[in-house]
């Protein structure tokens, strides 16, 4: 598992909860705006998680059924929305209500061992014991995001958003 995927999942789930309350979000009725371009940093990863949870897709998404394109998901995901402050915006197509969501993963620092382990692990120079320890501290951070801080408003920051 991955801290970026874990944080993305929390951002989308909590953003949808802010928009829908106890109602069930409707796939294909949600626009997703990404602040950055698709190839910037982890934007593509975050957008992939948002697509899985909301159905919103870029130009490659489902084009809909029949001449009216019912259930269309295509073009509901946009990149490079410079007008937003958060990492992403979730917008209901039925009501126009929208929230911008930001992840502050810095409140959950990596284990101190990670500073020495990460370069070795990604370059292929880590020993088997170092690789095992790398996996352990990596997963500790994922657990902290998904379990210990799942409801932490400092981790997932949600604010109302308007395009005006």
Language model regions located:
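Non-transmembrane, aqueous-exposed alpha-helical and coiled segments at domain scale
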Residues: 1, 8-164
């Amino acid at each position: 598992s991955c801290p970026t995927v874990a944080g993305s999942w929390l951002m989308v789930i909590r953003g949808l909860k802010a928009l829908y309350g106890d109602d069930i979000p409707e796939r294909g009725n949600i626009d997703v705006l990404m602040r950055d371009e698709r190839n910037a940093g982890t934007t593509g990863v975050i957008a992939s998680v948002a697509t899985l949870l909301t159905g919103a897709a870029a130009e490659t998404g489902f084009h809909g059924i029949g001449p009216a394109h019912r259930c269309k998901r295509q073009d509901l995901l946009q990149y490079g929305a410079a007008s937003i402050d958060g990492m992403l915006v979730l917008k209901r197509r039925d009501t126009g209500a929208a929230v911008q969501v930001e992840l502050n993963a810095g409140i959950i620092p990596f284990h101190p061992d990670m500073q020495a382990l990460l370069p070795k692990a990604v370059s292929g120079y880590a020993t088997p014991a170092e690789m095992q320890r790398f996996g352990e501290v990596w997963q500790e951070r994922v657990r902290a995001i998904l379990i210990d801080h799942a409801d932490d408003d400092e981790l997932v920051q949600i604010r109302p958003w308007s395009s005006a």
